[in-house]
From Swiss-Prot:
Spans annotated as Disordered: 85-107
UniProt xrefs under PANTHER family: 30S RIBOSOMAL PROTEIN S16, SMALL RIBOSOMAL SUBUNIT PROTEIN BS16M
Name the record gives this protein: Small ribosomal subunit protein bS16
One CC-aspect GO term: small ribosomal subunit
Signal sequence, start to end: none
Superkingdom: Bacteria
Key words, A-Z: Ribonucleoprotein, Ribosomal protein
Gene designation per UniProt: rpsP
Length: 107
């Protein structure tokens, strides 16, 4: 069973609110989950402490058990100082399209 820590959307139309949950990766985004770890309210100001609330002890336990955080949750954990997020690197992104196609044709 592949376990992931991710955001599950709640709230109403045009007023998003997210629960930070632990779920099996095969379950739907807003479907069944194993445990709720906190919440994220994107409508609040970025400097407001109530914008993101996480139970850090539970998060650490799930990470120790092998749960993989989603990209957005990994950002939250990096900000909280729990888990360092690796920078993504795409070296082909900087190469112009014409040069990229020429390099692929030359291979």
């Amino acid at each position: 069973m592949s376990v992931v820590i991710r955001l599950a959307r709640a709230g109403t139309k045009k007023r998003p609110f997210y629960h930070v949950v632990v779920a099996d990766s095969r379950f739907p985004r807003d479907g069944r989950f194993i445990e709720r770890l906190g919440y994220f309210n994107p409508l609040m100001a970025k400097d407001n402490e109530a914008r993101l609330k996480l139970d850090l002890d539970k998060v650490k336990d799930w990470l120790a058990k092998g749960a993989q955080p989603s990209d957005r949750v990994a950002r939250f954990l990096d900000t909280a100082g729990i888990k360092k997020r690796e920078a993504r690197n795409n070296p082909e992104k900087a190469v112009p399209r014409k040069e990229r196609k020429a390099a692929e044709a030359g291979k």
